[in-house]
Swiss-Prot record:
It is a multi-pass membrane protein. It comes from Verminephrobacter eiseniae (strain EF01-2). Its main location: membrane. It is found in: Cell inner membrane. It comes from the Bacteria. This is C4-dicarboxylate transport protein. The keyword Nucleotide-binding does not apply. Residues 415-439 are annotated as: Disordered. One of its GO terms (biological process) is L-aspartate transmembrane transport. GO terms for cellular component: plasma membrane. One of its GO terms (molecular function) is malate:proton symporter activity.
Length: 439
């Protein structure tokens, strides 16, 4: 099969766009800042399509299943995996920040820190308790969930709709076929939007460098380096071990989603590739039901990069302000973050809000220390988003294997590059709905 010219590869186009964005932002900062609408516009286009894509994917997956008990089993296995791996991420961040000590020697007095920037950044949002978080999953109305684009609310509606459609049996064939056609149209729209990915990546990167400057990285470079190193360690050591135990390579997996990772790098948003990740995980052999449940849910419960960031940032603040922490206090911090990290999605300024709430709950760490990392948070968000994206992708394959809903032959064929299906098109739907109806 003849390969497309290099310049037509989305991977090459996005990479070139990021480089051009960095150059423009560095040498012409005002022009770089002016490119912000390009990045914002691309992310809004993607967010526009996320809710209906999730709805169609989950409904078709559940309605087409013969054994409905598998849906509950898959959901339970997914939550178990999320809890184990996100806990590992918190522990990895805690251990490495203690070993590398990026904040040691800064000797900053918390009383001298200007906290106005923190108030401005975290003011619009607030942390919610566990009960309120769970109640917020139930939308005011079905229309409201889609209007707000709340992923968990849309997921709840999709699961209920899928179960109801399944119970209709043959009477639901017309609705099933209609949703299938809508799904195909939606993925065609996704393919069209993704052609603008280089423009979005260029705009977002030009703005970031133009506004904050490459020089702003140098002052807190040790923390940046430690965080990126920890994320790499987590991906290739922790997730690498998990993938090896489940029969595939994390290196090949990362290579398989390289285009999506470049888009995430350019936009600093893991949501920007959610529709493509749904499609690509299906193309790897994971069943639609598993992918439709695991990927969207992972955006709230499996934020590995965010978990690493939370422990590292908290201990960094303690080190920088010479605030001593005993082993018991670090264990307490870990326990608090196990709870608060689950509310890190869907909130404006979520990283700082969750971190501020956690520092307040622990009690002995200065919340004012958040101002130390505010300036470089935008650069750290890229590593968070990349780690979150890879983590959720791996989760969908692992949970699919646990649920016996994974075509392993297809998985290895795709990862070894033996097939060249377009990721922008959804995997052909199985004939389970048809066979179930005729039975």
């Amino acid at each position: 099969m003849t390969k497309a010219p290099l310049h037509k590869s989305l991977y090459v186009q996005v990479l070139a766009a990021i480089v051009i964005g960095v150059v423009l932002g560095h040498f012409y900062p005002p022009s770089g800042e002016a490119m912000k609408p390009l990045g914002d516009g691309f992310i809004k286009l993607i967010k526009m399509i996320i809710a209906p894509v999730i709805f169609c994917t989950v409904v078709l997956g559940i309605a087409g299943m013969e054994d409905m008990k598998k849906v509950g089993k898959t959901g339970g296995l997914a939550l178990l995996y999320f809890e184990i791996v996100s806990t590992l991420a918190l522990i990895v961040g805690l251990v490495l920040v203690n070993v590398l000590q990026p904040g040691a020697g800064m000797n900053i007095d918390p009383r001298t820190i200007d906290t106005k920037a923190i108030t401005a950044y975290t003011g619009p949002g607030k942390m919610t308790g566990t009960v309120e978080f769970l109640l917020n999953i139930i939308p005011v109305s079905m229309v409201d969930a889609f209007a707000k684009g709340d992923i968990l609310q849309v997921l709840l509606i999709s699961v209920l709709f899928g179960f109801a459609l399944h119970r209709f049996g043959g009477r639901g064939t017309m609705v099933f076929d209609f949703i299938e056609k809508v799904s195909q149209v939606l993925f065609a729209i996704v393919g069209t939007i993704m052609k603008a990915a280089p423009i979005g990546a260029f705009g977002a990167m030009a703005f970031t460098i133009g506004k904050y400057g490459i020089g702003s990285l140098l002052s807190l470079g040790k923390l940046m380096g430690t965080f990126y190193l920890t994320c790499l360690f987590f991906i290739f050591a922790v997730l690498g071990t998990i993938t090896r135990l489940h029969g595939f390579s994390v290196w090949k997996f990362v290579k398989y989603i390289k285009e999506e990772l470049l888009i995430v790098l350019g936009t600093s948003s893991s949501e920007s590739v959610l529709p493509r990740m749904l499609s690509k995980m299906e193309n790897l052999g994971a069943k639609k039901t598993v992918v439709g449940l695991v990927i969207p849910t992972g955006y709230s419960f499996n934020l590995d990069g965010t978990a690493i960031y939370l422990t590292m940032a908290a201990v960094f603040i303690a080190q920088a302000t010479n605030t001593p922490m005993t082993l018991m206090q670090e264990v307490t911090l870990l326990a608090v973050l196990l709870l608060t990290s689950k509310g890190a999605a869907g909130i404006t300024g979520s990283g700082f809000i969750v971190l501020a709430a956690s520092l307040s709950a622990v009690g002995h760490l200065p919340v004012a220390g958040l101002a130390l990392i505010l300036g470089i948070d935008r650069f750290m968000s890229e590593a968070r988003a990349l780690t979150n994206t890879i983590g959720n992708g791996v989760a969908s394959i692992v949970v699919a294997k646990w649920s016996k809903e994974l075509d392993e032959q297809r998985l290895h064929a795709q990862l070894n590059g033996q097939t060249a299906e377009e990721a922008s098109a959804p995997q052909a739907l199985p004939d389970r709905m048809e066979s179930r109806i005729h039975h």
